Amino acid sequence: MPRTDNDTWDLSTSVGATATMVAAARAIATNADNPLIEDRFAEPLVRAVGVDFFTRWVTGDLVAADVDDHDSGWKLEHMPVAMAARTRFFDSFFQGATQAGIRQAVILASGLDARAYRLAWPAGTTVFEIDQPQVIEFKTATLAKLGATPQATLRTVAVDLRDDWPKALVEAGFDKGQPTAWIAEGLFGYLPPEAQDRLLDNITALSADGSRLACEAIPDMSEVDTEKAQEMMRRATAKWREHGFDLEFGDLGYQGERNDVAVYLDGLGWRSVGVPMSQLLADAGLEAIPQTNDSVSVADTIYYSSVLAK
């Protein structure tokens, strides 16, 4: 079902199901030989959501070869490796920010992100998680049942990012006078182009000098045949439906020309360094993800780390 302006979801439907998919990939990456990341909460969270397809994937009852289209460049097989590299990037970002003295962190569209519970935060750090109310409530309750304890002061902000989230964040205790470490992981593709700009504007308005931002930017799709790319995605996930999971991924994102993230942030006073997923994989000693000519692949995604100078 196509997105609407006021649509909502839980972790088994729409955009929320992609958060569960990513957590499942983190769980598999965690359980790999010589794992690059360690997220012990990923698998129990996926199990608690209860989407059978992803539960079977993390337990090994379903393997990527069962559902992947071998002629497609987009495969479930690539997800654990890609999410391991992505997770490592954002984990390292927070580590660097806290080493620089930042003690306030914000995770936008936090989904099943358990960094507040699994990272070693310095004393005095406050972590804010922002997401839809159903998502926040489920994850918080599930982690409490697991006996998990936040490793920092955790403040959850149950608000849709299309609503007045800056007000809700400040009301939750956010201090605009303190430098902040922000992450927007796997978020921009689910926002219309103008909403992406508005989000960056709001982050800047809330950020003190020396704040940092890490984000995942959508590649330039101007040369991509959108209909052809969506058909490729439908083919890639056809066997998912045969195994009981039916989600039209092409309906979840927003098309349209976007401002280049680094250029836009530069205009707001941020200085950015970008690294493509292909480089993150190479730096971690992981196998490259094949690229195709008819669509934008995971390997094209750019990861930016930015610092604000006001």
Curated annotation (Swiss-Prot):
Its EC number is 2.1.1.-. Keywords: Methyltransferase, S-adenosyl-L-methionine, Transferase. One of its GO terms (biological process) is methylation. It comes from the Bacteria. GO terms for molecular function: methyltransferase activity. It holds the Pfam family LCM. The keyword Cell division does not apply. S-adenosyl-L-methionine binds at D131, D160, L161. The keyword Methyltransferase applies. It is an enzyme of class 2 (transferase). InterPro entries: Ppm1/Ppm2/Tcmp, SAM-dependent_MTases_sf, SAM_mthyl_Trfase_ML2640-like. Exhibits S-adenosyl-L-methionine-dependent methyltransferase activity. Belongs to the UPF0677 family. This is Putative S-adenosyl-L-methionine-dependent methyltransferase MAV_2110. It comes from Mycobacterium avium (strain 104).
